[in-house]
A protein has these predicted regions:
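Short, solvent-exposed aromatic-acidic interface loops
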Residues: 71-76, 121
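Surface-exposed beta-strand edges and flanking loops
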Residues: 7, 31-33, 55-57, 83, ...
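C-terminal interaction-tip segments
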Residues: 1-13, 33, 104-125
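Noncatalytic modules at the cell exterior or secretory-pathway interfaces
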Residues: 35-41, 91-109
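Surface-exposed ligand/attachment interfaces on beta-rich extracellular proteins
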Residues: 15-32, 45-67, 77-85, 106-109
Length: 125
């Protein structure tokens, strides 16, 4: 019999799944009371777009966000989104908040969403 992980994880959208046509900044995700986090980027259709994703971190929810150092990521942020893919990136940093920023260098659009999975909660969600 398999064990249940649903009650050991918490899933929060930082960029809700949508068709994007311009640069978008995700909402801050609070990592307080969690000892593990992963960022999941899910793409659908991509048309003439050159979106890149950057994961940012801060100790405050509304300001001070900077790019996460590569040493604090397990995996790479996509330089350009590819259609119908799922990318998972682990976060090992020590900041309380993370978010995703999608930057469009193209003239088209892309359908995607970015989700943060919080795990190893000190209190079950």
């Amino acid at each position: 019999m398999r064990t249940d992980i649903k009650n050991s994880l918490d899933v929060v959208a930082t960029l809700a799944p949508a068709a994007q046509t311009a640069t978008a900044t995700g909402t801050a995700v609070d990592l307080a009371n969690y000892d593990a986090a992963a960022v999941v980027i899910t793409t659908g259709a991509v048309a003439n777009a050159a979106f890149s994703i950057e994961i940012q971190e801060s100790n405050a929810s509304g300001s001070g966000f900077t790019a996460v150092a590569d040493a604090d990521l397990d995996g790479s942020e996509p330089a350009t989104l590819t259609a119908t893919t799922v990318t998972v990136i682990g976060y090992h940093g020590i900041k309380r908040y993370i978010r995703a920023v999608a930057t469009d260098a193209g003239t088209g659009d892309a359908s995607f969403g970015v989700t943060v999975i919080r795990g190893k909660g000190r209190v079950k969600p």
